[in-house]
Amino acid sequence: MLRIITGTAKGKKLKTLEGEATRPTSERIKEAVFSAIQFDIEDRRVLDLFAGSGQMGLESLSRGAASVMFIDSAREAIEIVKENAKTTGFSDKCKYLVSDYRNYIRKASGREGFDLVFIDPPYAMKSSIDAAKRLLEAGLLRAGAIVVLESGEDEIDLSELSSFEVIKSTHYGKKSFINILLYKEKEE
């Protein structure tokens, strides 16, 4: 059972999609991620790409984030996120969209950016790097944005993301690599 770890919604239980379609981030990994970014959450605009149950975005709201945009290509996932937002009392700070990440980024290009982004695609997709590059190219990352990439069994090649500084890169068990990156806007 997923739950909010700390903050204003501490202990609230979250629903998740049944079956193998989604793979929620484990509580151990979630705790490690939020421990690493704890001072970079309050009043931030958050993007939860590949939202699944929405637990990463909702945990951010519980810890003081201003708002979260949840994107998932599965309508069922977004419906679960909406239920979880209602359970935690954060519905008014949430926006939701059923969309493929590429389409969302293309359509959102040039709009107001995000301060904190969670990119956790299904492991088979191997699209963490592609999503981060597209967000950067579309101007959807604010200077100093934190990007959390979760990937499967293989470490991902971060050399394509030269505009980012690696804050933390950790392997959890046999199936999860977490990379926490800081976007450093290039000076003109």
Language-model features: where?
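Class I S-adenosyl-L-methionine-dependent methyltransferase catalytic core
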Residues: 1-188
